[in-house]
Amino acid sequence: MRERRDSTRRRFLAAAGAASTTALAGCSSILGGDGGDSSDRPTLADFRGSGEIVSDRPAPGGTSIEDLPDLEGELAVYLGGGEGGRYTTLIDLLNRYYDDFEASAQTQPSSQLANVIVDEHDSGTTQADVFWSVDAGSLAYVADNGATTALSGDTTSMVGDDRFVTEQWAGVAGRSRAVPYNTNQFSASDIPTSVDAIATEDRFAGTLGWAPTYGAFHGFVTAMRQLRGDDGTREWLNAMLDQNPARYDSEYATVSQGITNGEVGLGLTNHYYPILVFASNPDAPLDLAFTENDAGALVNTAGASVLDGAASPDLAELFVRHLLSAEAQEFLATRGFAFPMIDGVEPVGPLPTIDELSPPELDLQSLSDVQPTIELLEDVGILS
C-alpha cells in the first residue's frame, strides 16, 4: 500500500490547497433537491467543505439526518479540544437544523474534562450529558471509572470498524500519526517507514521538529510504551534528544512555522496539519508520509459517550447518532480532513483510507494510561 500513498501524497496536498470551509452552492434539501425549500435549515452544502478537493464528491452514504429521529430539548456537552472550533461549528449546524434543540458546549482539553467528569460522577454532581473527546484515551478513562452508560446497538452499529467503537463510546473522526516533510530538503524516498530510523540516522540530526507538550504527542508516546515497554520508549526518546530536535508549541506550528519555512526538514504530527497548512498556503514546500506498524503509524479517534447521570440520556445518545450521520461525517471529512467512521463516506482526495494505512496492533483504550508517559517524559528531560 505504501507505493500507492507515495504516488498520491503530493497530488493530495496540492488539491488540499484549494479547499476552504465556505459552502458549495446548490442543494437545499439535506442531500440535494430542486431548491424549493426556502427555510434556513442547513443543507449538505453547509456541512461540506468546498474547493477542488470536494468538487467531485458524490452525496455521502450512510444514515442521513433526515432518517434519524428529531433532536428535541436541551443538551450539555463537555467538548474536549474542539479541533480549532470545527466541532463547535458542527454543533451550531445541528442547533440550526432543529428548531426545538439547543446543545451548549463547555470546552477544555480532553484529559482535563475526563478528570472533571470522573470527579463529578464520584460526587453525584454530573453536569453534562455527552463527553465528546478528541482521543480514545480520555474516553476510555471516563468509561473505566464507571462514568458512562452503555450505548445501544443502533448507535454502535453505525461505526464501520470495531477498532473504533465499544459499548461505552463511539468513534466519530479518525486521525493518523504522520511524517510531514519539507520537499526542498527531502524527497518521498528519503522518508523511512519507521520512527526508529528518524531517531537514529545521522541524516536527520538537526532537522527534526516536534511538539512534546502537545496531547497528541503524549498519545503517540503512550502507544509506544504499550508496544515496546517503558525501557524501549526511554531509549527512543533519548535517541531523539541526541538528534537535537527543534521544539514547537503545537503540531500545527511544527508544520506551518517549522517545516514550511525550512527551519526543520520533517516532524512528527497528526496527518491533517499539513493539509490545513496547504489550505492557506498551496505553494508550501510540504508533503506527507506515513510510517508502518509502529507508534508513528498510530490511528486514534475522536469520539463521544453518554455520561452516567446525564439529565437527558436518550437525547444524548441520539446526539451521538447524529455525529455519525452522513452529513456530520461529511463535515468532519471535508472540513477537518478526518478519516470518516461510517461506511459510505470516504476521506478527501487521494488520502488513503484507514484500511490502507499500516497502524500497529493496539487497543486504543490502553491510551488512557497517560500519567506514566508524562512521568517518563519528565524523567528524560523532555518535560519539566
Regions found by a protein language model. Give the residues of each.
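Extracytoplasmic ligand-binding site segments that recognize negatively charged/polar headgroups
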Residues: 73-76, 80-88, 108-111, 126-263
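Sec-exported extracytoplasmic/periplasmic mature domains
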Residues: 92-100, 118, 122, 136, ...
